[in-house]
Amino acid sequence: MNVKPEEITSIIKSQIEKYEKKIETVDSGTIIQIGDGIARVYGLNGCMAGELLEFPNDVYAMALNLEQDNVGCVLLGSQEGIKEGNTVKRTGKVVEVPVGENIIGRVVNSLGHPIDGKGAISTTETRAVELVAPGVITRQAVKQPLQTGIKAIDAMIPIGRGQRELIIGDRQTGKTAIAMDTIINQKGKDVICIYVAIGQKQSTVAHIVNNLIETNAMDYTIVVSAAASESAPLQYIAPYAGCSMGEYFMNKGKDVLIVYDDLSKHAVAYRAMSLLLRRPPRREAYPGDVFYLHSRLLERAAKLSDKLGGGSLTALPIIETLAGDVTAYIPTNVISITDGQIFLETELFYSGQRPAINAGISVSRVGGNAQIKAMKQVAGTLRIDLAQYRELASFAQFGSDLDKESKRTLEKGKRLTEILKQPQYKPMAVEKQVMILFAASRNYIMDIPVERISEFEEEFLDYMDTHHREIGDEIKEKQVISDELSDKLRNAIEEFKKIFLIEG
């Protein structure tokens, strides 16, 4: 066999040319303790706060405690199969969630992974879950209304786009029902809705999703679910993940509504996590930064300036109280962060007043700025009328003789209370609200028996739809009641009353 030296030389030369010298450096550490979804890792000297760490079995964790000799982190998945001595790698990234148009209509978990059985979500963009809230210069005043479709709220506690309005009350008082009705009412209004379920039963979340599908509200809604069976870290990041998804649309100039249901369970999850991380407990065993936990989340709700596209993120956080105690630690924290609260009372709920809104304690700090002029015209005296009625009603129960004016105030109050009742999943268009509140506040329903008020309301709105559609259209278009329109509306009410009372 004849070996040519040139051939050997050329082979060696080509091999040398192809040789690539690569050194891959990995910053890794060792697990020294693991349990209850919390791990302590030795090493990782360059680790960032909130950094994503890679554990064995494709499980990730979030670094929260950066201590002198170890890093305390919370697992964002199952700790099964992970043991002390395993290697942990840094990723150099913070926790991110997928964002984009394709997430609309889907049910996802805290990490943005689909859990509705409809396959993977094709989206290329991601966004960090923890982001700094928009600054003062980047915002503008809240003045555009976000209609909830609930008469009592739109008339007395109006919500504006970019506002943070707390829904607070005991369990089973209709807090989630108000949030659901508000989402359903955004149909056709070009508002993207996000519902974040924190620590809820999976059956409850399934029921909510089914209702959203039945009312076609899922077409513009994202559901982020961190159910009660999920670990505390996943419940902790759920609202931030939902907020990041909403901010993506807000930055594109769109209007977004986000519901956090509920932040009481969120605080409990954070408390469990903090105690396991051995952070010092404070009042009610919550950590010292529990106020910051919610303030940094709710401050991300904003109405951006026109220069930045004019998008908005409206937040409806929900807080569950115990025996109506709004002076507890978490309720007072969130009340002080938000721009007002809708307070729901158990007594009102069981007396048949639904939604069970206590108009005396409930308030919107944006107020009339977030109302159309027509609503201001008809609902201006509503809160005072109801306050006078409540005061007189408590006085009248002692059987005192009342003068004519007091009796009239009582009768009007009874009718206003009936008018403000509303069944669930039946949000009302703003022009219909204006028409029925016009009839109530201007004393046109004083001769209708109290027990027939709801029947009167339903038939009156049907009558207006059939015979005087132009009145509703004008209110919707011009958003103000002119003298001419007021006369038309008055005549239509008198016309209908004759028919209604004859039939009755």
Curated annotation (Swiss-Prot):
InterPro entries: ATP_synth_asu-like_sf, ATP_synth_asu_C, ATP_synth_asu_C_sf, ATP_synth_F1_a_nt-bd_dom, ATP_synth_F1_asu, ATPase_a/bsu_AS, ATPase_F1/V1/A1_a/bsu_N, ATPase_F1/V1/A1_a/bsu_N_sf. HAMAP family: ATP_synth_alpha_bact (MF_01346). Belongs to the ATPase alpha/beta chains family. SUPFAM superfamilies: C-terminal domain of alpha and beta subunits of F1 ATP synthase, N-terminal domain of alpha and beta subunits of F1 ATP synthase, P-loop containing nucleoside triphosphate hydrolases. This is ATP synthase subunit alpha. The record marks S362 as: Required for activity. It is a peripheral membrane protein. It comes from Clostridium kluyveri (strain ATCC 8527 / DSM 555 / NBRC 12016 / NCIMB 10680 / K1). It catalyses: ATP + H2O + 4 H(+)(in) = ADP + phosphate + 5 H(+)(out). The gene is atpA. Its main location: membrane. Its EC number is 7.1.2.2. Produces ATP from ADP in the presence of a proton gradient across the membrane. The alpha chain is a regulatory subunit.
